[in-house]
């Protein structure tokens, strides 16, 4: 019975244990299934110039509206697309949206993608790559560290047709092979995984508008199931064409103004937008364990489908309610636990009420009136970013949690009356609401909705990051707080940008801990080729180092081979060396203590006492002190290097330095090394001191030996370099040698020692050293040891007492040692000493690095040396001087991508005339970080100084001198006042706030007269208009911009640019102004508006066959000012020919004008009635009288204002009278006409402007200003609702505008004259399309663009593809298509290189390889192809590798293997291979005649020998009897029917040479 009870008890125990185990497993499974997921990194690109999550927060917290007009750089027919009629086929009634105006920008080089492949890539792929990299960096993770990991990649997107409508472009052979991977949607995720080298799940999700939130849901599920441990989740949308606008216009789904008015009564549709957002997520438990900063937590998510509901694209309320409840269940939360919902909120009349009712039915039923559910919509700020909408909403809510504020929802006139708001407690965020942390210990929570037009719905529940556990205080770094801030980049330009970003970060983040930031920079940033390090012990010191080029350690990491430690001999010592490190470096102090113990057996003094210079301690003047101390310092510094991760692959010692090298190599124990250095130095002190000397000469060894022939007491002691030789011996002869060298101009330096190492004098201590060093126990080195005594590697235990005598007696071969090591692949030589003495003798082909320096023996110098090593490519372990990672890493700037524009050009057919049409457009700029100014600035003001503006300049760091320049101040008076200001330091910049042309001209002239060369900025208000929604430009102020464009050409050295402010600049606008003045944008024509910074661009204005908006024909009376001049008469003829009944031609001379009579007859013959009137068009009374006299039966219907006065003088000699004359007829006349005809119904009001006002023209400053006035006047009339068209003409053929000397000038520079008939056809088109402005010019961009920018680079022309291409063309490099074949079969390019001297061939061949590689990849310059960078990193794939092989095969005249590029993986390696194969000099010829024959034969193909009739003779010389009929007999004829000499003709030149000059057959 008892036995059964025991069995039952055991059974119950077992079952209970199993139940407990199963319960625990179920609990674990349940926990994993619902485990929260941490968001640890975020990145985005959104409308309004948003380039980061912080930018997004600034936008929404500031109630920013990011909606803008259509982009003008994508080939869209911006004007032709618009039609207010929603039924107009192929048109849209909406012409605004949320755009990424830099969507075409991409740093292809950074990602190792060739320009050609980048051009073929959907911009969505490029944005996804960029933001993915930034999201990882923002998490404090080095993206390259993820290679080989199971990172998941989940990206939402949809096909937007980047290549649609680009037929001609995509058929380009250059893009073949790239279009599939470039356009296919699956590559959105696949390319990210490929670039990062990850092998986890990679999925592209297309559920339309809900794509990115579905992607996040899938990422969460994958993490919970263990399919990956970390994941990227996000979405992207770019609209390369306007198809979406057209399609949704037919459905009447768009907001007319492009703005989503979410949940508002005024809602009228959604505003399409673009964007990209990426999150880096991992399981919460992993994030905590890995020490990653947690931004927020995904508590739960759900996805469902509408199914067969009210329509395929219609939203379905019940499905939305279900997905919300499922997400809450997944989060294990109740509706009342959520504070706010970031709604889908598109602003449609159908969708918003359905969504609101679903929210009210779920959340709204469990919220109180005191704590209602808040409802917001990011789309009201940026529009509907489609596949990126969900992730954008998540980023907004994460930022709201972090900042404790719920932003306002814009454009709500009142909450929608289509929603029953009383049915639940949901409150629309019509104003911002504080969102503080909860006092009851609860957590803030938000939910985000995203509903796809496809019917797929997603809902995600977010929670604020859990409270961070108190971490132990950050340990102060060893060494007194001196830390490195390393930064690196792929290119020098990117490095400079990185440095600038980090400097701005240090300046703006006063709370940053330098050591924590250093740890983050080391751990979370990829170490790239171009490197810099700031070293300092405080934020201020590091900031200052970043701001000053001389404060940084810089270098490159290319061609890193093996590392050798170099230990010098005497001469590195200085009093106090190493003392600071005893206190700041534990590793150094510990090693010195070991040395102290070892040395103490042989010396009666204390190592530490000597180093610290304690009273009574011996000095370094004694050889028996200095050598042991130097040894101890060197081996201790070696320990420090090794502690920081630098392990030598070899050691080299110079003289006594070989003792330290032997110890570090393991060839001597520390005790034996101490014995050698102490006892040998004692012997030197006892027997050699005072009897010798040493001298260093700047000569090679041979030259020194020649000089020593006259000195029997001297010998070469050491050969340190090609021109660095040391001599030792008799001190008297040393002095005599020094005198003779000085007399001969040879640099000589007597070394401060009184004994002669490496000379015959040493022989007297040979016996003593043999005795005292007997019993040494040398070992085989475990670190390779190269002996400068033997000139070879030491591999056996041979460093006995005899060796150390010989080391002291014989010559030191340091230079040959370095040469040998360099051949063996050693590239970096670290001189381990208290002061570098050998580094400067190293050849330029290797990198020499020091350790300490004289009087710089502390931690700062040590860290700087470590920084120099890292900057030059070595891997440094910074951990010993940095705090341990805590997970609280600072938000450092992410990589400063250096982008270029990649965008397929539209293939829409264009007429030849379209090539003449241009417009001005404004490109939104992405605002850079906080800028600052420095130095003295002069600010010219009118009567009332701009206090706020001046305050902004001062707050940015500028020292401001204000100078008032009134209308009555002439140039002389201004120059005198400027001269009086020029005392003390010079000026950094000049700002003109003048708003009138006359004082502005005087100001520019006075600056030159006063000799002030500081760059001048002209700051205006309302001088330009950046688009349809902007206020029209003020014509008078527009003249300042016309003038400025000419100053830029006439005085490029002292011109900075033009900046236009809004009428009422706020703090943000003034901050943008500072950014512009700092030069950070790189732009020189900038407009600042509430939407940000805009840069002026010239762009093509093709009509693309667009239908005219009206059928314009002249009729009635047409008034032509300047009507008897060349341009006016052309216009008159055209008007008469096309139906004008009455032509009223106005000029100053009237009928007395030359040719007036003939013109009248010609026009009359065309059927028009002609009136020629003498009248000053600038006289309003005279013009009023003239207009009143126009017959009622032919009313005035059109005006053509061609009148103007020539103005071709440089600005420096332009006086007030010239200004009045030029402006009189042109601008005053136009203003009079505008004023007198206001309200008169006209069909056309044409202003003849000029290209001078568009891009400037030298010596036409006032003329350009006048034309800018006309362009602005036309826009002002349009804004008033009256017709106006300004045409900025180029050069006309025949008599007319711009003739004479200027004609030839502009033709030479690429402005070709236009035929008047064709020019007038362009005028007719502009009128038929009712255009406000168009520039018409025939430009040869290959000539004009370089000429226009030769003295001053300008981005103005960047919007014209031909100009951009002309400016990007490499200059002075071999042409990539050079296939001209030289007589040898080589290309002419290689033949030219062959003709160069041998030392110049290698670099020339490398340039040729880089040039061809650049051409294959699509780069504009070989500079973009780094010599040492792998072809795979440069963007080569199998296709482009074969293309490069083909080009180089043509160059060398021989077919190269298909694997050539991959067999020689860098341009430098490939160039070296080609040099050896095709350019290496032949083996030295045994005789001169043989060399001449070889060269002659190498240059002559066999056909030439045969044709010359000498082939038989050459063959006979080789011992071969030619066959009959070979065609090579002297004077003989070939047999036409004979077989060709295949065996001979197939020989290459080298084979023929071997045949001719090889052994003779006997």
Swiss-Prot record:
Binding site for NADP(+): 1124-1127, 1147-1150, 1176-1177, 1226, 1248-1249
Region span, Acyltransferase: 565-866
Keyword terms of this UniProt record: Acyltransferase, Antibiotic biosynthesis, Multifunctional enzyme, NADP, Phosphopantetheine, Phosphoprotein, Transferase
Modified-residue entries (O-(pantetheine 4'-phosphoryl)serine), positions: 1438
InterPro entries: Ac_transferase_dom_sf, ACP-like_sf, Acyl_transferase_dom, Acyl_Trfase/lysoPLipase, Ketoacyl_synth_AS, Ketoacyl_synth_C, Ketoacyl_synth_N, Malonyl_transacylase_ACP-bd
Positions of the Ketosynthase family 3 (KS3) domain: 34-464
Active site: 209 (acyl-thioester intermediate), 344 (for beta-ketoacyl synthase activity), 384 (for beta-ketoacyl synthase activity), 655 (acyl-ester intermediate), 1263 (acyl-ester intermediate)
GO biological process: fatty acid biosynthetic process; macrolide biosynthetic process
Segments forming domain Carrier: 1403-1478
E.C. no: 2.3.1.239, 2.3.1.240
Composition bias, Low complexity: 1532-1541
Region (Module 5): 37-1475
Pathway connected to this protein: Antibiotic biosynthesis
Gene3D superfamilies referenced in this protein's UniProt entry, alphabetically: 3.30.70.3290, 3.40.47.10, 6.10.40.10, ACP-like, Malonyl-Coenzyme A Acyl Carrier Protein, domain 2, NAD(P)-binding Rossmann-like Domain
Catalytic reaction equation(s): 5 (S)-methylmalonyl-CoA + malonyl-CoA + 5 NADPH + 11 H(+) = 10-deoxymethynolide + 6 CO2 + 5 NADP(+) + 6 CoA + 2 H2O; 6 (S)-methylmalonyl-CoA + malonyl-CoA + 5 NADPH + 12 H(+) = narbonolide + 7 CO2 + 5 NADP(+) + 7 CoA + 2 H2O
Phosphoprotein in keyword set: yes
Location of region: Disordered: 1519-1548
Transmembrane stretches, start-end: none
Function, in words: Involved in the biosynthesis of 12- and 14-membered ring macrolactone antibiotics such as methymycin and neomethymycin, and pikromycin and narbomycin, respectively. Component of the pikromycin PKS which catalyzes the biosynthesis of both precursors 10-deoxymethynolide (12-membered ring macrolactone) and narbonolide (14-membered ring macrolactone).
Record's miscellaneous remark: Type I modular polyketide synthases (PKSs) catalyze the step-wise condensation of simple carboxylic acid derivatives. Organizationally, type I PKSs are arranged into modules, wherein each module is comprised of a set of catalytic activities that is responsible for a single elongation of the polyketide chain and the appropriate reductive processing of the beta-keto functionality. A minimal elongation module contains an acyl transferase (AT) domain, an acyl-carrier protein (ACP) domain, and a ketosynthase (KS) domain.
Quaternary data: Homodimer. Pikromycin PKS consists of a combination of multimodular (PikAI and PikAII) and monomodular (PikAIII and PikAIV) polypeptides each coding for a functional synthase subunit which participates in 1 (monomodular) or 2 (multimodular) of the six FAS-like elongation steps required for formation of the polyketide. Module 1, 2, 3, 4, 5, and 6 participating in biosynthesis steps 1, 2, 3, 4, 5, and 6, respectively.
Name used for this protein in its record: Pikromycin polyketide synthase component PikAIII
Source organism per UniProt: Streptomyces venezuelae
Lineage: Bacteria, Bacillati, Actinomycetota, Actinomycetes, Kitasatosporales
Gene name of the encoded protein: pikAIII
């Amino acid at each position: 019975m008892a036995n059964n009870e025991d069995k039952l008890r055991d059974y119950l125990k077992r079952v209970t244990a199993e139940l407990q185990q199963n319960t625990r497993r179920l609990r674990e499974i349940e926990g994993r299934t619902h485990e929260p997921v941490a968001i640890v990194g975020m990145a985005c690109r959104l409308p309004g110039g948003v380039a980061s999550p912080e930018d997004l927060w600034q936008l929404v917290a500031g109630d920013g509206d990011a909606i803008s007009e259509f982009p003008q750089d994508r080939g869209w027919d911006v004007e032709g697309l618009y039609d207010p009629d929603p039924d107009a086929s192929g048109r849209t009634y909406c012409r605004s949206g949320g755009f990424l105006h830099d969507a075409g920008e991409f740093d292809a080089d950074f990602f190792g993608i060739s320009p050609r492949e980048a051009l073929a890539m959907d911009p969505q792929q490029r944005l996804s790559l960029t933001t993915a990299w930034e999201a990882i960096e923002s998490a404090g993770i080095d993206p390259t560290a993820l290679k080989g990991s199971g990172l998941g990649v989940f990206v939402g997107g949809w096909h937007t047709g980047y290549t649609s409508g680009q037929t001609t472009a995509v058929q380009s052979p250059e893009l073949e092979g790239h279009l599939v991977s470039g356009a296919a949607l699956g590559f959105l995720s696949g390319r990210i995984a490929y670039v990062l080298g990850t092998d986890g799940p990679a999925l592209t999700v297309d559920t339309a508008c809900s794509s990115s939130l579905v992607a996040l849901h899938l990422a969460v599920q994958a993490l919970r199931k263990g399919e990956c441990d970390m994941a990227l989740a996000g979405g992207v949308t770019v609209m390369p064409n306007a198809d979406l606008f057209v399609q949704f216009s037919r459905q009447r789904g768009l907001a007319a103004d492009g703005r989503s008015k979410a949940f508002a009564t005024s809602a009228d549709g959604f505003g399409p937008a673009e964007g990209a957002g990426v999150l880096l997520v991992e399981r919460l438990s992993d994030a905590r364990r890995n020490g990653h900063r947690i931004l927020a937590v995904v508590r739960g998510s759900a996805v469902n489908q509408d199914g067969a509901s009210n329509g395929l694209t219609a939203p379905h309320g019940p499905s939305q309610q279900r997905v919300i409840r499922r997400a809450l269940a997944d989060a294990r939360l109740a509706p009342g636990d959520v504070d706010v919902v970031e709604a889908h909120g598109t602003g449609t009349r159908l969708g918003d009420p359905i969504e609101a009712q679903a929210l009210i039915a779920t959340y709204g039923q469990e919220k109180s009136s005191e704590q209602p559910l808040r409802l917001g919509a990011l789309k009201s700020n940026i529009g509907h970013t489609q596949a990126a909408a969900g992730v954008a909403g998540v980023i907004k809510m994460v930022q709201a949690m972090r900042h404790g504020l719920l932003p306002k929802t814009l454009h709500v006139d009142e909450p929608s009356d289509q929603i029953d708001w009383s049915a639940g407690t949901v409150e629309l965020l019509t104003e911002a609401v504080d969102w503080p942390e909860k006092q009851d210990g609860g957590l803030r929570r938000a939910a985000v909705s995203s509903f796809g037009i496809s019917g797929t719905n997603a809902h995600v529940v977010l929670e604020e990051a859990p409270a961070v556990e108190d971490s132990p205080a950050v340990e102060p770094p060893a060494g007194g707080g001196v830390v490195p801030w390393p930064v690196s980049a792929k290119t020098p330009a990117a490095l400079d940008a990185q440095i600038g970003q980090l400097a701005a970060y240090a300046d703006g983040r006063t709370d940053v801990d330098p050591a924590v930031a250093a740890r983050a920079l080391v751990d979370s940033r990829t170490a790239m080729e171009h490197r810099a390090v700031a070293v300092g012990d405080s934020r201020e010191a590091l900031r200052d180092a970043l701001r000053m080029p001389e404060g940084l350690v810089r270098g490159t990491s290319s061609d890193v081979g093996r590392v050798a430690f170099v230990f010098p001999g005497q001469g590195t010592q200085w009093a106090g060396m190493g003392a600071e490190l005893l206190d700041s470096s534990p590793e150094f102090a510990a090693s010195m203590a070991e040395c102290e113990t070892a040395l103490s057996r042989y010396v009666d003094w204390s190592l530490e006492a000597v180093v610290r210079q304690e009273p009574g301690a011996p000095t370094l003047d004694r050889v028996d002190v200095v050598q042991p101390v130097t040894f101890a310092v060197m081996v201790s510094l070696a320990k420090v290097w090794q502690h920081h991760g630098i392990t030598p692959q070899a050691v080299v010692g110079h003289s006594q330095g070989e003792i330290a090298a032997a110890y570090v190599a393991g060839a001597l124990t520390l005790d034996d090394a101490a014995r050698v250095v102490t006892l040998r130095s004692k012997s030197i002190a006892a027997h050699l001191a005072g009897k010798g000397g040493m001298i260093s000469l700047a000569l090679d060894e041979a030259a020194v030996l020649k000089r020593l022939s006259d000195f029997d007491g001297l010998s070469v002691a050491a050969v340190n370099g090609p021109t660095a030789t040391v001599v030792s011996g008799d001190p008297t002869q040393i002095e005599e040698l020094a005198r003779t060298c000085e007399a001969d101009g040879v640099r000589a330096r007597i070394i401060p020692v009184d004994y002669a190492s490496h000379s015959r004098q040493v022989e007297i201590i040979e016996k003593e050293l043999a005795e005292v060093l007997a019993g040494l126990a040398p070992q085989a080195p475990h670190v390779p040891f190269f002996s400068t005594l033997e000139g070879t590697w030491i591999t056996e235990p041979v460093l006995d007492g005899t060796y150390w005598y010989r080391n002291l007696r014989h010559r030191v071969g340091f230079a040959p040692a370095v040469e040998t090591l360099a051949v063996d692949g050693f590239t970096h030589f670290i001189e381990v000493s208290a002061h570098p003495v050998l580094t400067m003798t190293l050849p330029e082909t290797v990198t020499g690095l020091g350790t300490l320096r004289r009087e710089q023996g502390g931690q700062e110098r040590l860290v700087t040396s470590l920084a120099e090593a890292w900057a030059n490519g070595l891997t440094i372990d910074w951990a010993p001087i940095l705090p341990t990672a805590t997970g609280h890493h600072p938000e450092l700037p992410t990589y400063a991508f250096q982008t270029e524009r990649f965008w397929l050009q539209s293939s829409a057919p264009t007429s030849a005339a379209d090539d003449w049409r241009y417009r001005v457009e404004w490109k939104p700029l992405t605002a850079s970080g906080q800028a600052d100014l420095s130095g003295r600035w002069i600010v010219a003001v009118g009567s009332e100084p701009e206090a706020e503006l001046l305050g902004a300049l001062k707050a940015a760091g500028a020292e401001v001198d204000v100078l008032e320049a009134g209308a009555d101040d002439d140039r002389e008076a201004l120059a005198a006042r400027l001269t009086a200001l020029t005392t003390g330091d010079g000026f950094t910049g000049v700002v003109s706030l003048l708003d009138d042309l006359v004082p502005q001209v005087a100001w520019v002239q006075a600056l030159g007269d006063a000799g002030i060369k500081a760059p001048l900025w002209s700051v205006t208000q309302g001088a330009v208009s950046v688009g349809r929604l902007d206020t029209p430009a003020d014509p008078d102020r527009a003249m300042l911009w016309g003038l400025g464009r000419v100053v830029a050409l006439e005085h490029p050295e002292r011109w900075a640019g033009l900046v236009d402010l809004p009428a009422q600049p706020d703090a943000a606008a003034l901050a943008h102004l500072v950014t512009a003045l700092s030069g950070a944008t790189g732009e020189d024509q900038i407009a600042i508006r509430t939407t940000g910074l805009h840069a002026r661009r010239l762009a093509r204005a093709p009509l693309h066959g667009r239908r005219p908006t009206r059928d314009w024909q002249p009729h009635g009376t047409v008034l032509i000012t300047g009507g008897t001049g060349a341009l006016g008469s052309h216009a008159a003829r055209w008007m008469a020919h096309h139906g004008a009944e009455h032509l009223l031609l106005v000029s100053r001379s009237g009928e007395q004008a030359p040719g007036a009579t003939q013109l009248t007859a010609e026009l009359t013959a065309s059927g028009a009635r002609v009136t020629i009137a003498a009248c000053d068009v600038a006289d309003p009374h005279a013009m009023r009288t003239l207009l009143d006299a126009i017959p009622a039966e032919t009313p005035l219907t059109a005006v053509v204002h061609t009148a103007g006065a020539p103005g071709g003088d440089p600005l420096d000699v332009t006086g007030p009278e010239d200004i009045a004359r030029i402006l009189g007829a042109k601008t005053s006349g136009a203003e009079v006409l505008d004023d007198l005809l206001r309200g008169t119904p006209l069909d056309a009001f044409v202003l003849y402007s000029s290209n001078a006002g568009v891009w400037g023209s030298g010596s036409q400053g006032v003329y350009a200003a006048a034309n800018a006035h006309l362009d602005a006047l036309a826009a002002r009339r349009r804004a008033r609702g009256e017709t106006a068209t300004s045409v900025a003409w180029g050069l006309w053929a025949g008599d007319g505008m711009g003739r004479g000397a200027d004609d030839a000038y502009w033709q030479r520079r690429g402005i070709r004259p236009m035929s008047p008939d064709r020019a007038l056809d362009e005028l007719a088109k502009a009128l038929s399309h009712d255009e406000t402005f168009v520039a018409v010019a025939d430009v040869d961009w290959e000539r004009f663009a370089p000429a226009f920018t030769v003295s001053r680079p300008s981005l103005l022309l960047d919007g014209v593809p031909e100009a951009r291409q002309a400016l990007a063309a490499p200059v002075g490099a071999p042409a990539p298509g050079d296939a001209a074949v030289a007589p040898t079969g080589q290309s002419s390019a290689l033949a030219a290189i062959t003709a160069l001297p041998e030392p110049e061939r290698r670099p020339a061949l490398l340039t040729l390889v880089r040039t061809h590689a650049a051409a294959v990849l699509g780069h504009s310059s070989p500079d973009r192809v780094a010599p040492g960078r792998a072809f795979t990193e440069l963007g080569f794939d199998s296709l482009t590798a074969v293309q490069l092989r083909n080009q180089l095969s043509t160059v060398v005249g021989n077919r190269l293997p298909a694997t050539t590029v991959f067999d020689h993986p860098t341009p430098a390696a490939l160039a070296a291979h080609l040099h050896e194969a095709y350019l290496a000099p032949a083996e030295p010829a045994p005789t001169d005649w043989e060399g001449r024959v070889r060269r002659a034969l190498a240059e002559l193909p066999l056909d030439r020998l045969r044709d010359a009739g000498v082939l038989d003779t050459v063959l006979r010389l080789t011992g071969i009897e030619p066959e009959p009929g070979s065609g090579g007999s002297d004077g003989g004829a070939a047999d036409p029917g004979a077989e060709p000499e295949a065996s001979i003709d197939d020989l290459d030149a080298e084979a023929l040479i071997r045949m001719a000059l090889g052994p003779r057959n006997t």
